UniProtKB/Swiss-Prot annotation:
GO molecular function: ATP binding; four-way junction DNA binding; four-way junction helicase activity
Family: Belongs to the RuvA family.
Highest taxon, organism lineage: Bacteria
Protein name as it appears in the record: Holliday junction branch migration complex subunit RuvA
Region (Domain III): 155-206
Region called Domain II, residue ranges: 65-142
Gene Ontology annotations for the cellular component aspect, listed alphabetically: cytoplasm; Holliday junction helicase complex; Holliday junction resolvase complex
Region Domain I: start-end pairs: 1-64
Record's function text: The RuvA-RuvB-RuvC complex processes Holliday junction (HJ) DNA during genetic recombination and DNA repair, while the RuvA-RuvB complex plays an important role in the rescue of blocked DNA replication forks via replication fork reversal (RFR). RuvA specifically binds to HJ cruciform DNA, conferring on it an open structure. The RuvB hexamer acts as an ATP-dependent pump, pulling dsDNA into and through the RuvAB complex. HJ branch migration allows RuvC to scan DNA until it finds its consensus sequence, where it cleaves and resolves the cruciform DNA.
Record has Cytoplasm as a keyword: yes
Assembly with partners or alone: Homotetramer. Forms an RuvA(8)-RuvB(12)-Holliday junction (HJ) complex. HJ DNA is sandwiched between 2 RuvA tetramers; dsDNA enters through RuvA and exits via RuvB. An RuvB hexamer assembles on each DNA strand where it exits the tetramer. Each RuvB hexamer is contacted by two RuvA subunits (via domain III) on 2 adjacent RuvB subunits; this complex drives branch migration. In the full resolvosome a probable DNA-RuvA(4)-RuvB(12)-RuvC(2) complex forms which resolves the HJ.
Nucleus is among the record's keywords: no
Organism (species): Teredinibacter turnerae (strain ATCC 39867 / T7901)
UniProt gene name: ruvA
Amino acid sequence: MIGRLTGNLVVKQAPNLMVDINGVGYDLLAPMSTFYQLPELDAKVVLHTHFAVSETSQQLFGFIDQQDREFFRMLIKVNGVGPKMAVGIMSMETNDIVRCILEDNLNALVKVPGVGKKTAERLIIEMRDKLKSWQVTPSVDATGSLVALDSAAPSQNAIVAEAESALVALGYKPVEASKAVARVTSDEITRSEDLIRLALRNMIPA
């Protein structure tokens, strides 16, 4: 069982990333809560991991901290929620997901790609009691430091393209992704992660 990886971040294209450890590249899927806090490429990264095995595949999932991983594991215990759907659900801020569940907010939950009314209802029923004592930890990046901007800012077109690609990978239609990104695009935004976060908040108001 692989519980944690420490290495250099060599691929960062939501929801996929790769960590190089002594010349071996580990492919992982990660929720947006992790991508928001990743360092720049080639920097050292520490990720807590979950190894999911099914009849047809084996997949590593990476998380900034153990609390994110714990929340992911809570999600996949819900009837009908698999690991990839859990990653999609965690495109919402953890605080927002918890609040939606505790407040029975079906309307927000069903806006997540792949989550229908029945799945949203199961999330609320099966997780509500478990989340009543949930504590959210302060945001830090994957090196253990406070979140900081990348030193080399990509072009605005590249940021927009990366944000749209990430939303499509999360299950949104290309037209939906393009419109959502266009609504929140600003010259002041210098990271695709920030643009994705704003677009998701606009698409899934909690």
